[in-house]
Each structure stands twice: as C-alpha cells, then as structure tokens.
C-alpha cells in the first residue's frame, strides 16, 4: 500500500527523529498565545502519528519545549487492534466503535488501542492469523491492522 500523504507540523527538537511515533494529545495552555500555534496544532487530537521526515530549517523557540521545536513531516500510524472475526476482511472500510468491555479483560488494550477514535473510518490493511486470547463476552476475535 502506498505511503499516505504527510502533514507538516512542529514538534519538540528532542523528539524530531524519523521513525518516532507519538499520540497527539492536544494543545498545552501555553500554546494559546503562540504565533506558531496553527502549525503545531494542525493534528487530530488523540490520533497516533509517525515522523517520516525532517524539514530543513532552524529550531524555533517554544514555551512548552525547552530546546525549541523543529518542522517535521508526519503520517497517521496504522493501529493494531482486535475485532470480531466475522467483520475482519482485508481491504474493507469500517467505522470504529469501541466495544463495551471489562477493563480486567486480557484483550482490553487491543480492543481499545491508543490512537484510535470512535466514529472514525479505517481500512483493514491486514488480518493476522495469530490467535487472540479468549474474549470474556464469548466473541471470536482477530488481530487486525487499521489505517485511517
């Protein structure tokens, strides 16, 4: 599958390394008065991203990051999750709905992975053949890779 289009944003200089993955949590209070906030805050809150490139340019001062920020190219990361096996087909589009699960379940983190948003559309890029532990609700689960 082709690499998705990238977005240019600013990130703390210490974190500006290709391959670094992060979840954008939204603006800090200090960002409100910054003249660069439109570039920094152009990502979707609680979505997972990977840095795929660095832009040429200088470090810029930042009230949040002590060593300043750099311009980087980011793409939305694929998400590893589990879903009902009867719905897991390579290439299909789906709208993610978080299942109602017990937090003590062994699969809870895979059923509710970080960086995924309820109501967002994802494409199932791969259905893995490996076994997933038993579901407390009695569902048959498959591990999948989802892309926005």
Curated annotation (Swiss-Prot):
Organism the protein comes from: Methanocella arvoryzae (strain DSM 22066 / NBRC 105507 / MRE50)
Pfam families (UniProt xref): UPF0179
Family statement: Belongs to the UPF0179 family.
Name of the protein this chain belongs to: UPF0179 protein UNCMA_27840
Top-rank taxon: Archaea
PANTHER family, alphabetized: UPF0179 PROTEIN MJ1627
